[in-house]
């Protein structure tokens, strides 16, 4: 993109508790096709700061609203400000819906075109309500996984809950831009309704995948690429099934596996250096094999500990809401601000304490009498 040949701009917003790397695949594919792409960390996620608002999705789009305003005000002379879009998955999809509503209201108030020309909503339909859709002045594509495990929250129940052909959420999205005489009772998936020129274009997709796999699915990615090709026109047109993002994921996986494999060889290499020679120790003698009683105790402790871990998680979630009330209500606070991680922290601390108690009791009641040497635990530290 250059100032002489401006390109459409697309903001990408990841889902809940995700950093920008989670949607790098769609960023790669959109940028290959010549769009200007900004992949952000939502507020309070990744490297982004927190928001003072407890309604960061509605009022700020998790940071997307400010970005759209910044771009629209001419911060980048190579961006076509008449072609600004947003896309996101899950919580990021909600941000896209909220963006269509926010900038739509702004356009109505100022009697202007919406700054957010088009949005693509992936994996989220809970806020596709009349009070939000009615003010939208953006083209809108909706993609929802047919086997989305969160569909139980939708308006329909059972198997129909994720069926976007008959879902009230998708019907409202489409019928809201159609004349009363042309309104439909069943959505034709992949069909474009409305008018691009009037910013009322609508399309619904319903890919047969699970919610977390939707951003990593060739069909879902292709549908999104086709949508932006339809509303903006790609500066560098490429077939939507010509995708390379999976190579990045494959090599990232290989990199992770190799990093784990290399831990022991690299540790041995460092231990061969003179600087680390003082920490080398002889391999201790193996412990005696467990007898029948020892095996019973071992497996009993294993299953009891696992059971305690299972049944204590939900209570720890409830306790976290009480101990960290500000964080639980999304208020910005210095006192343990990560509301989702606070529950895990309490659960881990409680089960760690239970584990220490069980471990100590098993040693005192059984291990000590059967030749278990505490030195074999590797907990002792000698002064240099």
Describe the predicted segments one by one:
Residues 181-192, 276-287, 363-377:
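Cytoplasmic juxtamembrane interface segments
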Residues 300-384:
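Alpha-helical transmembrane segments of integral membrane proteins
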Residues 225, 229, 235, 269-275, ...:
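Membrane-helix interface motif
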Residues 239-251, 289-291, 328-346:
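Membrane-interface segments at the starts/ends of alpha-helical transmembrane spans
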Residues 257-303:
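Juxtamembrane interface at the cytosolic side of transmembrane helices
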Residues 1-245:
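Soluble extramembrane regions of membrane proteins in the secretory/endomembrane system
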Residues 244-255, 288-307, 378-383:
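Alpha-helical transmembrane segments and their helix-start/interface "positive-inside/aromatic belt" motifs
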